[in-house]
């Protein structure tokens, strides 16, 4: 009766096995389609639950020309393919497509009424990674499910969330950012992924990412309105995160 306090039992896993067997049998003699692979990944995410609470998030990056994924959330998909709710979907390109692509993509997005697919520019991700000189841009980057963080293949994000309350002062927010940064810095050292391939550990340790995010900004008068004061606050909060990370990185060696 508490959050995360009750086991889900074996049924979600049984459902996954049944779904996988049916999918493979339906594709006998051929390769799985991109949409079948997408659905199978979503189904795996669907069974990652604790106490009936979802504990997974996915993003599916597909070729611009992939019509199957473009239409994955068109019509009343939730009635027959409910697992697709687990993933955000985006078209991923490395070279600027022709105008026709954007036109057809926006038309499909509007007609689906789901707000998807999004668009992810891999070349822009490489340019941003190279911009500050601290990351190796020579990767086919993807992104985390909410698309805040550029990621290598086989890599985790490391995001700590600050909950903003309506009456929070700058001093209160700085304190929250400091604690979130401490948690994130500690979490960045947890790289013993014993059930994953070594490449996951290598990438996570090499980049040692840290992200501190603000949620609830629309409830706060300063944070929800573009202004010079907002810019000042955000810069000061960023400085707190950077300084706290440096302090705790030294402590941790």
For the regions a protein language model found, what residue spans apply to each?
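Short, well-ordered loop/turn elements at secondary-structure boundaries
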Residues: 43, 53-55, 87-88, 102-107, ...
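Function-dense linear segments that define catalytic or interfacial modules
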Residues: 1-2, 111-224
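Alpha/propeptide regions of enzymes that mature by internal proteolysis
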Residues: 11-47, 90-99, 105-109, 117, ...
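Active-site-proximal structural scaffolding
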Residues: 13, 33, 37-40, 102, ...
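Internal maturation/activation junctions in enzymes
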Residues: 52-96, 188-201, 205, 209, ...
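Catalytic alpha/beta active-site cores
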Residues: 1-39, 128-131, 135-140, 157-161
């Amino acid at each position: 009766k508490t959050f995360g306090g009750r086991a889900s039992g074996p049924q979600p896993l049984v459902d996954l096995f049944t779904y996988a067997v049916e999918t493979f049998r339906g594709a006998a003699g051929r390769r799985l389609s991109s949409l079948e692979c997408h659905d199978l990944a979503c189904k795996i995410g669907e069974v990652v639950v604790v106490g009936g609470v979802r504990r997974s998030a996915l993003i599916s990056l597909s070729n611009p020309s992939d019509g199957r994924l473009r239409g994955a959330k068109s019509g009343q998909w939730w009635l027959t393919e409910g697992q697709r709710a687990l993933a955000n979907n985006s078209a991923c390109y490395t070279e600027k497509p022709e105008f026709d692509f954007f036109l057809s993509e926006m038309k499909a997005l509007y007609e689906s009424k789901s707000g998807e697919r999004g668009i992810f520019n891999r070349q822009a991700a490489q340019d941003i990674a190279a911009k500050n000189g601290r990351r190796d841009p020579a990767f086919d980057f993807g992104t985390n499910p909410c698309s805040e963080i550029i990621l290598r293949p086989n890599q985790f994000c490391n995001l700590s969330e600050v909950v903003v309350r309506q009456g929070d002062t700058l001093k209160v927010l700085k304190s929250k950012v400091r604690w979130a940064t401490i948690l994130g810095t500690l979490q960045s050292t947890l790289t013993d992924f014993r059930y994953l391939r070594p490449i996951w550990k290598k990438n996570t340790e090499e980049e040692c990412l840290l992200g501190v995010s603000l949620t609830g900004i629309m409830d706060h008068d300063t944070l929800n309105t573009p202004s010079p004061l907002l810019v000042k606050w955000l810069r000061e909060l960023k400085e707190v995160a950077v300084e706290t990370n440096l302090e705790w990185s030294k402590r941790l060696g």
